[in-house]
Amino acid sequence: MCLTPTDRSASRTRLELFVGNTLAFVGLVLCLAGTASEARAEAKTTAPAETVQALFVSDIHFDPFIDPAKIPLLAEANPSEWAKVLAAAPSVDRSARYAAIQKTCPTRGEDTSYALLNSSLQAIRKEAVGARFATISGDLLAHSFDCKYRAAFPHAAPGDYRAFVEKTLTFVVDELRAALPGVPVYVALGNNDSDCGDYKLNAHSEFLATIGEELTKGFPASERAGAKETFAAGGYMSVRLPAPLRNARLLVLDDLFMSAKYTTCGGKPDASAAEAELAWLEQQLTVARGSHEKVWVMAHIPPGVDVYSSAKHLDEVCGAKGPKMFLASEKLAEVLARFGDVVRLAIFAHTHMDEVRILQPENAGNSPSAANGMPVKMVSSISPINGNAPSFTVARVDPETAVLKDYRVIAASNATGLDTVWHEEYDWAKAYHEPDFSAASVGKEVAGFESDAAQKMEESRDYISDFYVGASPLLGLIWPQYVCALRNDSAQAFKACVCPMGK
């Protein structure tokens, strides 16, 4: 409160009155200025923190074999020359020759052509123009990549296939870097991103060392050597997220080694690489907890239940076999769930769908991670192979807390990349009326889904519609079973949720 003299003695001289009133006026001005300054300071501290933009891309599945006449040219060219080759007019017999490759190497549909890749990059330039960093959460290479290569080069020399894989990966990453100049691009490998076939990879390989050299370009010098070393060992690495994010770190995993389908290039199962990676992850999270770092974790294959495969065999889920799981064990989910106080976001992909999940420890007691758990964002695909519309995600992040505040899914009007219009599919905050994508907010939405088996809530209907980007709401047919997987990441918990008591 500002006080001014109001009671003046009648005997005071005019000079005294002038001086007194002047001083009172000055005091009033200074007081009001101080009050305004305090108000501005208070407003500054209570106003919502300014967010920064980030880009999430996944499952690009770029197919360089779509015009077979160009494949020998690509094999001879450097990745920096690929765009010129791919942009040239298609060969006259392109369709017939590619159909022959598809017959030899059948897939569900077609992956990402150069036209679609180029269209998506143009949309990214427009929609993510302010991005401070970008993530690619795996599967840069087309499905049946190794089969298509052998069909194109039946007499290829040893090592040629690996060289072509390395060139393709480099080309795709460099194209995204060119679309967002100066923006760090962080990449996790997926099950297709291998020099020896789908779900096959050797730890401590020359392939991982070569790709690690490429993917760590632009990393801070103080961190690049360590990142290259761990990536060469098992496809995992640690890097500090860029300013203006503060004291925030990204841990990138190659959880192909943890997959239920994983084998070495020689076709043998081997759990040692997964065990080493999980030990590294736990050590990194322990250090981060001690130094009060905020962590994001990114990998390709999510932990938990493969709902699509499990829903086709519900009798097995409720029987002795149990549900189909994405990973060979539940150790990744268990490690992550123990560090819910450290990890602000986990990014996965693999299903090609737009999904959310939450990881919560089943027996956490009073541990720091018990309160809310960990939010999981599963990024939808650029590839339209499942009939979905190509899409990517533009996110907003709180630089102080590293919490994902909001995101928008941007989808294509067609799968060809020709005359394609990209539009906003939905906005998380607007669709679900949540202040952020924190564990508390995601947990609240999941709880709502769990209570809405009949799909009467607007949020449930929105999720069903947005899950299969641009396509029909088929998820509604298995909605109760699907919802069981959003929180119940262990086989036992999922089975208890889905199956009637006692069966």
Model-derived regions, located:
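Bacterial N-terminal signal peptides
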Residues: 20-34
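N-terminal secretory signal peptides that target proteins for export/translocation
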Residues: 1-17
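Metal-dependent phosphoesterase/phosphodiesterase active-site architecture
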Residues: 42-136, 207-291, 334, 353-503
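Active-site environment of divalent metal-dependent phosphoester hydrolases
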Residues: 63-64, 142-145, 187-198, 259-261, ...
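Core catalytic region of metal-dependent phosphoesterases/phosphodiesterases
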Residues: 79-95, 99-199
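Signal peptide processing junction and immediate N-terminal pro/mature segment
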Residues: 32-43
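Active-site-proximal segments of metal-dependent phosphoesterases and phosphodiesterases across multiple
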Residues: 260, 265-278, 286-343
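Active-site neighborhood of phospho(di)ester-bond hydrolases with catalytic His/Asp-centered motifs
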Residues: 56-58, 132-139, 181-191, 297-300, ...
